Swiss-Prot record:
Coiled coil: none annotated. It comes from Ricinus communis. It comes from the Eukaryota. Its main location: membrane. Keywords: Cell membrane, Glycoprotein, Membrane, Transmembrane, Transmembrane helix. This is CASP-like protein 1F1. Residues 1-16, 87-105, 172-179 are cytoplasmic. Homodimer and heterodimers.
Length: 179
């Protein structure tokens, strides 16, 4: 019975599972942040009222600019961390290396969460407005712009969840550090 438990709970199998999960989650994070960035950057809609043309673009809002920048940074840093993880390969069981991944994932998760929060706040104003401040909703007129922005934010929230899972797994693995 002990041999069966040792076989399924061996450190090597645990290490392979950890690395496999890390690689898969980082690939999903890279894809989600890249897609969120691309959708938001290409999000533009124009409407015409007689001779007057109104345009909605992501770069008209500092919150959307921050959202895009946060996703670009998270995507680039996730690519670097994926390369770091692949380069370490067998040596990634070093608790010091895992702790660096934990810090990286925590910072990237915080950055993506901040970007998502800023974009969500502006998206909420765009959808519902704020009558007390005199801000009217614009999503009635700019439906395509708002829908694409919503998809971009959903992808970014997906990447934030992946980064949260990476943070938790790295924190769990780095508990082996002996001071």
């Amino acid at each position: 019975m002990e041999n069966v438990e040792d076989k399924y709970n061996s450190p090597l199998k645990s290490q392979k599972l950890f690395i496999g999960a890390q690689i898969c989650l980082r690939i999903v994070t890279i894809g989600a942040t890249l897609a969120a960035t691309w959708i938001m950057v290409t999000d533009k809609q124009s409407i015409t009222f007689g001779d007057f043309v109104m345009v909605a673009k992501y770069n008209y809002s500092s919150a959307f600019k921050f959202f895009v920048l946060a996703n670009v940074i998270a995507c680039a840093c996730s690519v670097v961390s994926l390369l770091f993880l692949c380069a370490l390969g067998r040596y990634s069981s070093n608790p010091g290396h895992v702790f660096l991944l934990f810090l990286h994932d925590l910072l990237m998760m915080s950055l993506v969460l901040a970007g998502c929060s800023a974009a969500t706040a502006i998206g909420f104003l765009g959808k519902y407005g704020n009558t007390k401040s005199g801000w009217m909703p614009i999503c009635d007129q700019f439906g395509q712009f708002c829908n694409r922005g919503t998809i971009s934010m959903m992808l970014s929230y997906l990447s934030m969840v992946c980064l949260l899972i990476l943070t938790v797994t790295s924190a769990n693995k780095s508990r082996q550090i002996h001071v």
